[in-house]
């Protein structure tokens, strides 16, 4: 056991133990992996009484998550899972913590997953969902986009796609433990391998193969680390220091800052991949959710207040 592991709180030790069990049978077929992930979330996480859930099927599938904290802004959220696992239902509880902190309605999109639907299907779905939210009357200045892991990469793919099409950009964006380099060239892929309880290079490679089906992993919409990031809205990046995707986040922050993007980078000591999932009992999970809420309100408050003024 490392010194870092020896100093973990009981709550954090519980997180590591729980994450280790999710994909413990890495030789399973995709259907079994999906079922295991959904069962993990169903068994361990539950919505608070003040959370309202509204299912949407057309024009895009997903769940609206709303809490009693308010609904003055909209957050379009892309779940993680290597573009192959995860769902809006699995991420509903995590989304509710963010919704409460940001005083926002959160729409968790069920984008088409690989390998049944390869790149660029997820990006196309993200564009459709964003346009739908704006066409429903939302002021883009009060809209936020965000996601975790693969969803963090999808967030950046959406932003660069909107910019290149000269479409309205959201007020800000949030990337949690983002996966933005599908070639896995970051030093932490190897350097943090003994610390990360969930992800492995081999596992990420399998997800990349499913998503790409032989396509070039360096395409900017696949690996936004290689994208032109100029002109994007303020960006919050959160990452744990014990995850193999640490360098994805650090390099993204460096390149976005160099491109003139206002970047807030927050590293959480000893946190594993997407620790926010455990906000119900992990203090750092609640802290990270509250940090997202503060960031969102900082960058959308003026527009949200203006929209509430009588006309």
Give residue ranges: language-model regions.
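A glycine/proline-hinged amphipathic helix-loop "lid/cap" segment
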Residues: 1-70, 301-311
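Short strand-loop-helix active-site module centered on a catalytic nucleophile
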Residues: 62, 76, 98, 119-182, ...
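Short beta-strand element of the alpha/beta-hydrolase
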Residues: 72-81
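The serine-hydrolase catalytic nucleophile loop
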Residues: 85-96, 248
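Catalytic nucleophile-loop/oxyanion-hole region of alpha/beta-hydrolase
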Residues: 88, 94, 107-142, 279-285
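Hydrolase active-site cap/lid region
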Residues: 160-215, 231
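Serine-hydrolase catalytic core
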Residues: 215-271
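Catalytic active-site module of serine/aspartate enzymes centered on a nucleophile-bearing elbow/loop
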Residues: 282-311
């Amino acid at each position: 056991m490392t010194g870092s592991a020896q100093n973990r709180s009981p709550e954090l030790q519980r997180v590591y133990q729980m994450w280790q069990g999710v994909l413990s049978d890495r030789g399973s077929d995709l259907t079994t992996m999906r079922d295991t992930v959904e069962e993990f979330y169903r068994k361990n996480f539950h919505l608070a009484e003040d959370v309202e859930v509204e299912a949407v099927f057309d024009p895009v599938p997903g769940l609206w998550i709303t809490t009693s904290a308010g609904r003055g802004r909209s957050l379009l959220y892309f779940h993680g899972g290597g573009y192959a696992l995860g769902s809006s239902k699995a991420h509903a509880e995590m989304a509710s913590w963010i919704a409460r902190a940001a005083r926002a309605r959160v729409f968790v999109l069920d984008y088409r997953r690989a390998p049944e639907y390869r790149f660029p299907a997820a990006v196309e779905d993200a564009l459709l969902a964003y346009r739908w939210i704006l066409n429903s009357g939302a002021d883009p200045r009060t809209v936020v986009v965000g996601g975790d892991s693969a969803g963090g990469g999808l967030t950046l793919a959406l932003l660069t796609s909107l910019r290149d099409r000269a479409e309205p950009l959201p007020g800000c964006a949030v990337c949690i433990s983002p996966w933005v380099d599908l070639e896995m060239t970051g030093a932490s892929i190897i350097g943090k391998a003994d610390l990360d309880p969930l992800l492995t290079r081999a596992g990420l490679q399998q997800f990349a193969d499913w998503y790409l089906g032989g396509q070039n992993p360096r395409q900017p919409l696949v690996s936004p680390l290689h994208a032109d990031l100029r002109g994007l809205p303020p960006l919050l990046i959160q990452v744990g220091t014990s995850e193999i995707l640490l360098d994805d986040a650090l390099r993204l922050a460096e390149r976005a800052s160099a491109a003139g993007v206002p970047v807030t980078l927050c590293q959480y000591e000893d946190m594993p991949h997407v620790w926010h999932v455990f906000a119900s009992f992990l203090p750092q999970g609640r802290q990270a959710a509250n940090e997202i809420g503060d960031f969102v309100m900082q960058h959308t408050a003026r527009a949200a207040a203006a929209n509430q003024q009588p006309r």
